[in-house]
Each structure stands twice: as structure tokens, then as C-alpha cells.
């Protein structure tokens, strides 16, 4: 079966594990005498080959509070690894990313709590997630998780961060625990119709999201709260098509080089001057995308699509229009002659006439009819940035080709 072939590609070898252990030895030496644990997919045995981020959590008594993590704990960790290649990253609170032998190690300060439902910060639940998963998955189950993760990565729905709004690693593990194996997850997902409820434990509150998986270690939390309806739909359709015609294309989509430019495509390249939390930046980018689309439609442009991609510092926004050319003037349709609002319409407009249908009309001048200017004005980033903008002429990179193509390679 194709899944066995995929596993040969994505399952780590003993050599891979030894390499990770060497990196962990360096980290263990630096964090000596601290209360720390290795967490995440490496600890759970569900990690993918050549996709290794190690999570190391340093625990502090819950009584010290969140502010202690952000200052004292963070400084303590930095002092221990400052001679290594490291950067600061930001989520609910700051943490450290160390790069050793091309392996990224996230060192995250957290509070030691009694149970997952007593979590003070989001990361405090992590040890309980690890314990739950390792106690419910055997070796075959871990491979089934690997298949599901790679499938979701291939179709673009993996990652709970705001930029993606997809499935977290923990969500994939719970899906395998609930349904049993990769194929069974796809069989059920192919029949999904939201709202979808998957209950490994009874929920402790009412959830409103389209996909609901109450967290077994904290039933007040929906594990899949971040998953967008678009990604749920994409996963369901991909599952249906894979079951009909299994292909490596779902796991490792091919790169399409040529794609015709349809309509007019505006490219906005943003370079951010400051480092910030990825979720904060992408929250602002998503608002910008929505605002650009609304503004262009309000000014009379026919918008085909607006998308954004990139990382925390370099972001591309692509705006596809039926045409970038729009008239300086437009037909303004007014009320019927018998309407009580005709006097107001006449007062506010010039060049007014009565049409054959008994309705009043006027000619109005657009306040703005340059799409590039409108798009730039509606970027709502709160950090300083440089911008380069141009209308697409040539086929450029894979992301732009993907934007132009629209249809996933696994679908056609």
C-alpha cells in the first residue's frame, strides 16, 4: 500500500534519533538542576523525519505567576544558553529558540500545575497532553499519526498558528486515538458536515466552532477551536479524493512551474522592521487582507481573490482582480419616482435624470480608482514596514504559481 511507502520516507531512522539525542545532551547540560522535561512530538514518538523541532519545557512553581516566566525565568534560561545560536520568540509569553546542528530546540518556561484543567498559561497543559497521548498510542498508532500529519501538511491544513488556522499535532494524535488509524480518519472525515463533534471526553462547556474535540486533559477547551471552516472543508474533500485514488501527491504535492495570469494581479511585498509574535503579525495581516478586499469591492472593483503568505518578517499579499482598470465615473442608481427619498437623492447628486423605468439616476465620480493605492491604504500593520508593489507580469515563485492555479495539485 502507498501508506507503507510514505512511512519509509517520513519515519525517523535510528540514526536520526541518535542525532536528536546528541542535541538534547547539550541542552540537558545547560539546564542542569532546573525542573525541565522534553515534550512535543519527539517525546510522544510522533515526529516526522527532517521535520524536527524539539520542545523543552522548564517548569517553575505555579505560585511565582506568569510575570516571573516573562522576566526572571526567561533571563535565567538565556544566561544558560547565551553562547549558543539562539533567538527570542513570542507566543502567550516569550520563549527561546536554540539552533544546534540544524535542529531547532524551543525552550519554553511554564508553570507546574496539578492537572491540565488547572493551567494558568496555555503551555502548562503540555505535560498532560504528552502523558495522555503516550498512554493511548502504541507504535503502530504513532505511525498512523505520522501519516495523518504528512497528509495534512501536503494539503496545507497542518498548523494551529493563526497564519494557517489548521490542525495542531495534538489534534492529529487525538483523531488517531478516536478513530483508530489513518484510513479510518479519512473515511469519517470524508463524510463530515459541520458542526462535527468528536468526544474522547465529555465537554465541560458549550462550543460554537465547526469542529469540536474537547481536550481530554481540560474539557473546558476545544482542541480544534483554531481550525477554520476552509481547512475543515479542504481536509474532508482531500480525504474523499484520496480514498478514491490514493497518491503520493496528497503527501508531497508536485510543483507546477507554469500558470497563466488571469485578470490583473497586484503583488505587495512587505518587509517588517521589527520582530513580533507570529500570531500578532498574522492577525493584522488577515485583517489587512479582509480590509483590502472590502475596500476594493466598495470602490467598484471585481475581486477574484486576495491571499497572503510568508513568515513573520517577509510577507506577500496577492490581489487578483478581473481588471485593474475602472472608470473615473460610474452610474449611481437612485430611488423610484414615488419614493420619499427622492428629494434627498436630488440634493446630494448632480447630473440627475429619470430613467425609462421611473427610477432616478446620476453620474458620480469615484473618490479613488487606483487599485494599488486602495490596497496600500488598507494595510493595518502596527509595526514599521517597507513595501514594494507591482502588477504581475512574469511567472515568479512557487507560491505565486499556487495562488494563480487555485486548484490543489491533488484535486486535478
From Swiss-Prot:
GO terms for molecular function: ATP binding; CCA tRNA nucleotidyltransferase activity; magnesium ion binding; tRNA binding. Catalyzes the addition and repair of the essential 3'-terminal CCA sequence in tRNAs without using a nucleic acid template. Adds these three nucleotides in the order of C, C, and A to the tRNA nucleotide-73, using CTP and ATP as substrates and producing inorganic pyrophosphate. tRNA 3'-terminal CCA addition is required both for tRNA processing and repair. Also involved in tRNA surveillance by mediating tandem CCA addition to generate a CCACCA at the 3' terminus of unstable tRNAs. While stable tRNAs receive only 3'-terminal CCA, unstable tRNAs are marked with CCACCA and rapidly degraded. ATP binds at residues 41, 44, 129, 149, 158. Its EC number is 2.7.7.72. Belongs to the tRNA nucleotidyltransferase/poly(A) polymerase family. Archaeal CCA-adding enzyme subfamily. The gene is cca. Its cofactor is Mg(2+). Homodimer. Keywords: ATP-binding, Magnesium, Metal-binding, Nucleotide-binding, Nucleotidyltransferase, RNA repair, RNA-binding, Transferase, tRNA processing. This is CCA-adding enzyme. Mg(2+) binds at residues 53, 55, 106. It catalyses: a tRNA precursor + 2 CTP + ATP = a tRNA with a 3' CCA end + 3 diphosphate; a tRNA with a 3' CCA end + 2 CTP + ATP = a tRNA with a 3' CCACCA end + 3 diphosphate.
Amino acid at each position: 500500500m502507498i501508506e507503507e511507502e510514505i512511512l519509509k520516507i517520513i519515519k525517523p531512522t535510528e540514526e536520526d534519533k541518535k542525532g536528536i539525542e546528541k542535541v538534547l545532551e547539550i541542552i540537558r547540560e545547560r539546564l542542569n538542576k532546573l525542573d525541565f522535561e522534553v515534550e512535543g512530538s519527539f517525546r510522544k514518538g510522533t515526529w516526522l523525519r527532517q521535520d524536527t523541532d524539539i520542545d523543552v519545557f522548564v517548569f517553575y512553581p505555579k505560585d511565582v505567576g506568569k510575570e516571573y516566566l516573562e522576566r526572571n525565568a526567561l533571563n535565567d534560561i538565556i544566561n544558560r544558553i547565551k553562547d549558543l545560536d539562539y533567538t527570542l520568540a513570542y507566543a502567550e509569553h516569550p520563549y527561546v529558540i536554540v539552533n544546534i546542528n540544524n535542529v531547532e530546540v524551543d525552550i519554553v518556561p511554564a508553570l507546574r500545575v496539578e492537572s491540565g484543567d488547572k493551567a494558568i498559561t496555555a503551555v502548562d497543559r503540555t505535560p498532560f497532553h504528552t502523558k495522555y497521548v503516550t498512554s493511548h498510542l502504541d507504535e503502530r498508532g504513532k505511525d498512523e499519526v505520522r501519516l495523518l500529519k504528512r497528509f495534512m501538511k501536503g494539503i496545507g491544513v497542518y498548523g494551529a498558528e493563526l497564519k494557517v488556522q489548521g490542525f495542531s499535532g495534538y489534534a492529529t494524535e487525538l483523531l488517531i486515538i478516536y478513530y483508530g488509524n489513518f484510513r479510518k480518519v479519512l473515511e469519517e472525515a470524508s463524510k463530515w458536515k459541520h458542526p462535527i463533534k468528536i468526544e474522547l471526553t465529555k465537554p465541560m462547556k458549550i462550543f460554537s466552532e465547526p469542529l469540536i474535540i474537547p481536550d481530554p486533559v481540560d474539557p473546558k477547551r476545544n482542541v480544534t477551536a483554531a481550525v477554520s471552516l476552509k481547512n475543515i472543508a479542504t481536509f474532508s474533500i482531500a480525504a474523499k479524493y484520496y480514498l478514491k485514488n490514493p497518491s503520493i501527491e496528497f503527501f508531497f504535492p508536485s510543483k507546477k512551474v507554469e500558470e497563466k495570469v488571469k485578470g490583473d494581479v497586484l503583488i505587495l511585498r512587505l518587509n517588517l522592521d521589527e520582530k513580533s509574535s507570529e500570531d500578532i503579525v498574522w492577525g493584522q495581516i488577515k485583517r489587512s487582507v479582509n480590509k483590502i478586499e472590502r475596500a476594493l469591492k466598495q470602490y467598484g472593483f471585481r475581486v477574484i481573490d486576495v491571499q497572503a503568505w510568508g513568515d513573520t518578517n517577509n510577507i506577500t499579499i496577492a490581489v487578483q482582480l478581473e481588471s485593474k482598470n475602472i472608470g473615473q465615473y460610474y452610474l449611481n442608481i437612485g430611488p423610484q419616482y414615488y419614493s420619499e427619498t427622492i428629494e434627498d437623492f436630488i440634493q446630494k447628486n448632480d447630473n440627475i435624470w429619470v430613467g425609462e423605468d421611473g427610477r432616478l439616476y446620476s453620474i458620480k465620480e469615484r473618490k479613488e480608482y487606483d487599485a494599488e493605492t486602495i490596497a496600500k491604504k488598507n494595510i493595518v500593520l502596527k509595526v514599521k514596514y517597507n513595501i514594494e508593489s507591482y502588477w504581475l507580469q512574469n511567472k515568479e515563485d512557487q507560491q505565486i504559481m499556487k495562488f494563480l492555479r487555485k486548484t490543489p495539485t491533488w484535486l486535478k
